[in-house]
């Protein structure tokens, strides 16, 4: 017959204070932790093997022998083997276990919050958030908004007087009548400068006309350059305008024609007229002995021509009225010539001079001449 072993307890120990209530709590704890099921299974196996054991042994299997406030150690005799099981107080478990778990969770959460609070600003400083890409279907609206608005929309409408483009711009914004200044039925559509339609035939015709005019101008300039080379001037490289070139060419041609007529030397010497001075030199019928008089008259005409071709002459510098080189002024001078005066001389033929030539020359042609 097996006896239960009970250790001696000190009177001041917390185990000695435990009573029947404590034992019942320990039994409840052992059932909750699954210890009771293990003990019952082992006890049934021991009953089958031992068979002749006493009932007192079976009754004393579940009796706790030692209890404590913090934990109870239970000595159980199963098949002659003493087994000790430890169980905590139910109140202590209810108080300690949830508190420990909650404290752990709170501590973990607090640590995570601290780390997040420290990491979030650093992450924002190092890695700024990316801007979202604009949608592709609103490209037209963005282009209208990005266009520079130097004037407000009503001012631009007054400046350009474009009603349809203004309505198109307002339709994009969704407020078509906010900037409408005039009703659409009164405004007439006017083409903008960039909307001028150019026909291909017009372009080709314009190009052909420009090229033809350029070619004509080049030919005219070339002809004037060739004519300028034939006109003798005192500075050979003197620059002359087109009007001056034409006037000098006419005078030079008339001088050469008169010179050729004088060199023929007939009995009836026709009167020669200078183109510039209007000097008309007439001769009576003279024979071959009249050569000195003819040479003197030709010499005077040559001197007058050279004077007109000099830089200080009126031909080199045109009058104020003829600065533009208009042909009307030249035709007026040729159409209405002044009446010439006749100067008689005792020696030589009569001389016909105009009033303008008398004022310009201011000197007598011969010492014995009289007015």
Curated annotation (Swiss-Prot):
Any one Gene Ontology biological process term? hemangioblast cell differentiation
Its domain of life?
Eukaryota
Q: Name one Pfam family in it.
A: HLH
Compartment annotation: Nucleus
Q: Does the keyword Acyltransferase apply?
A: no
| Keywords annotated in UniProt | Developmental protein, Differentiation, DNA-binding, Nucleus, Transcription, Transcription regulation
| Composition bias, Basic and acidic residues | 34-57, 293-305
The UniProt transmembrane annotation reads: none
Q: Which residues form the signal peptide?
A: none
Q: Which terms does the record give in the GO molecular function aspect?
A: DNA binding; DNA-binding transcription factor activity, RNA polymerase II-specific; protein dimerization activity; RNA polymerase II cis-regulatory region sequence-specific DNA binding
Q: Which InterPro entries match?
A: bHLH_dom, HLH_DNA-bd_sf, TAL-like
Write out the ranges of the annotated region (Disordered). 1-71, 263-371
Q: Composition bias, kind Acidic residues: at what positions?
A: 321-335
Where expressed (tissue)? Expressed in the main hemopoietic organs in adults, namely the kidney and the spleen. Also expressed in the liver, brain, gill and gonads.
Annotated bHLH domain ranges read 204-256
A GO CC term attached to the entry: nucleus
* Chain's role: Transcription factor that plays a pivotal role in hemopoietic and endothelial development.
Q: What is this protein called?
A: T-cell acute lymphocytic leukemia protein 1
Q: What is the lineage of its organism?
A: Eukaryota, Metazoa, Chordata, Craniata, Vertebrata
Q: Coding gene? A: tal1
């Amino acid at each position: 017959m097996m006896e239960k072993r009970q250790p001696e307890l000190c009177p001041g120990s917390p185990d000695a204070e435990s009573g029947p209530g404590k034992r019942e709590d320990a039994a409840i704890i052992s059932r909750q932790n699954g210890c009771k099921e293990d003990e019952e299974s082992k006890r049934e196996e021991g009953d089958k093997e031992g068979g002749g054991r006493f009932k007192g042994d079976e009754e004393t299997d579940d009796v706790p022998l030692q209890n404590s406030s913090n934990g109870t150690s239970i000595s159980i005799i199963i098949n002659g083997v003493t087994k000790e099981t430890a169980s905590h107080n139910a109140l202590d478990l209810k108080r300690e276990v949830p508190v420990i778990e909650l404290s752990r969770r709170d501590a973990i959460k607090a640590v995570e919050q601290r780390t997040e609070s420290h990491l979030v600003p650093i992450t924002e400083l190092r890695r700024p958030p990316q801007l979202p890409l604009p949608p592709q279907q609103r490209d037209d609206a963005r282009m209208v908004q990005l266009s520079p608005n130097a004037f407000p929309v009503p001012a631009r409408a007054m400046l350009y007087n474009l009603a349809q483009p203004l309505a198109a711009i307002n339709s994009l914004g969704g407020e078509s009548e906010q900037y409408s200044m005039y009703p659409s039925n009164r405004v007439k559509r006017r083409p903008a400068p960039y909307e001028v339609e150019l026909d291909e035939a017009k372009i080709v015709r314009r190009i052909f006309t420009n090229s033809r005019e350029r070619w004509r101008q080049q030919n005219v300039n070339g002809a004037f350059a060739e004519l300028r080379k034939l006109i003798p001037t005192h500075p050979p490289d003197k620059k002359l305008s087109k009007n001056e070139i034409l006037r000098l060419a006419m005078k030079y041609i008339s001088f050469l024609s008169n010179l050729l007529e004088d060199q023929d030397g007939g009995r009836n010497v026709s009167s020669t007229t200078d183109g510039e001075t209007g000097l008309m030199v007439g001769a009576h019928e003279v024979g071959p002995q009249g050569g000195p008089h003819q040479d003197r008259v030709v010499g005077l005409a040559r001197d007058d021509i050279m004077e007109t071709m000099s830089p200080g002459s009126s031909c080199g510098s045109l009058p104020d009225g003829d600065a533009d080189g208009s042909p009307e002024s030249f035709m007026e001078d040729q159409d209405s010539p002044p009446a010439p005066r006749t100067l008689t001389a005792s020696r030589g033929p009569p001389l016909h001079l105009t009033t303008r030539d008398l004022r310009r020359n201011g000197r007598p042609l011969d010492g014995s001449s009289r007015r």
